[in-house]
């Protein structure tokens, strides 16, 4: 009988419960315990049949865990991540890695110095659609990629903000909450970001953050492209509504990413390639063809990958260093928007 990887879950909020649901279905992992100071978490633990603890220290000392999933508020990630690292326990830390690049660097350095694996929960990288898109771009099928456009237009209703007041506070706008996913995927496909130019518009609902942002990114591969994000636009063009990852979002047949190469273009997530038949040119006929793939749940893929990381079979697909790089770009967006200047990423 296969030995299951024993996991503990810290934080039983919305994403924490989603992790629990996935682990309970996993063929490679077993959820042993959960920890959360909220009393409702104990009822949840009893409901799903696992041990309950009020904090991480108790869970680690009282359970024989192979790994821990950290799904707590961003400002607690550095404290909880360091505790796992100091105990020699691999962790999967939800995105973003920390509330600042400085805190992310502390986690990244500690993980490296102690030789303890940290996987950052940018789960979309585990989607077969993204794996296929990266391969198409890397293969040269559309030639040298010169530019891209990414769209993340959503309309979050008032009740979304009423449920959790922190969503109205500074640092909880669509750039931090939503765009960080797109930054990670674009870095994964296009390379490292070297400079950022950005404009943001203050929330019309009176929140402390932005509700619209446009960003120009330049990569070390000489790719330049734009991202537009908003949580106040009704549209079908976002990863949530196009990728069909989460059944909570009604699916559309649209795309949200466009990659333009000198031999063709690629739309994602539908993986449609547009190319001229023979001679390239704007007067020449252009046809499309779709790549077909077998889709699987990226959250389940992430848990399976975490198990492989714990066993030492694979390095983390999104290491703490990768999480740090995403936060540097994120902070660069805010710096550029505030100063009106191009911000160089170092």
Sequence positions of predicted segments:
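N-terminal Rossmann-like dinucleotide-binding module
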Residues: 1-48
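C-terminal helix-rich "cap/oligomerization" subdomain common to oxidoreductases
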Residues: 1-4, 67-70, 268-269, 305-346
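Beta-loop-alpha module in the N-terminal Rossmann-like domain of NAD(P)-dependent dehydrogenases
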Residues: 19, 37, 48-110
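Hydrophobic residues in well-ordered beta-strands that form the structural core
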Residues: 54, 93, 118-120, 149, ...
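Rossmann-fold dehydrogenase core element
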Residues: 106-124, 143-149
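Predominantly a Rossmann-like dinucleotide-binding segment in NAD(P)-dependent oxidoreductases
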Residues: 124-208, 213-217, 340
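NAD(P)-dinucleotide binding in Rossmann-like oxidoreductases
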Residues: 206-210, 220-301
């Amino acid at each position: 009988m296969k030995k299951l990887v024993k996991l503990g879950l810290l934080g039983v909020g919305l994403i924490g419960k989603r992790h629990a649901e996935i682990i309970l279905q996993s063929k490679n992992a077993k959820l042993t315990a959960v920890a959360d100071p909220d009393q409702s978490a104990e009822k949840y633990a009893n409901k799903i049949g696992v041990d309950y603890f009020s904090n991480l220290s108790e869970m680690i000392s009282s359970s024989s865990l192979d790994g821990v999933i950290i799904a707590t508020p961003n400002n607690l990630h550095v404290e909880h991540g360091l505790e796992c690292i100091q105990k020699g326990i691999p962790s999967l830390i939800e995105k973003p890695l920390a509330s600042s690049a400085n805190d992310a660097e502390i986690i990244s350095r500690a993980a490296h110095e102690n030789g303890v694996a940290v996987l950052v929960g940018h789960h979309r990288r585990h989607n077969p659609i993204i794996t296929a898109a990266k391969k198409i771009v890397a293969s040269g099928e559309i030639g040298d990629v010169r530019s891209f456009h990414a769209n993340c237009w959503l309309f979050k209703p008032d009740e979304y903000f009423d449920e959790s007041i922190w969503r109205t506070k500074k640092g909880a706008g669509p750039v931090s909450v939503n765009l960080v996913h797109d930054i990670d995927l674009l870095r994964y496909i296009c390379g490292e970001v070297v400079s950022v130019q950005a404009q943001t518009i203050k929330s019309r609902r009176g929140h402390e953050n932005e509700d619209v942002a446009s960003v120009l990114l330049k990569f070390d591969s000489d790719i330049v492209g734009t991202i537009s994000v908003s949580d106040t636009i009704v549209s079908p063009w976002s990863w949530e509504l196009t990728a069909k990852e989460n059944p909570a979002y009604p699916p559309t047949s649209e795309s949200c990413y466009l990659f333009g190469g000198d031999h063709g273009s690629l739309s994602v997530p539908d993986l449609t390639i547009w190319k001229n038949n023979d001679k390239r040119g704007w007067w020449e006929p252009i046809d499309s063809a779709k790549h077909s793939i077998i889709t699987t749940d990226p959250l389940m893929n992430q848990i399976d990958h975490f198990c492989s990381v714990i066993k030492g079979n694979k390095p983390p697909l999104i290491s703490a260093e990768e999480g740090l790089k995403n936060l540097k770009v994120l902070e660069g967006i805010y710096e550029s928007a505030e100063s009106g200047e191009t911000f160089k990423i170092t």
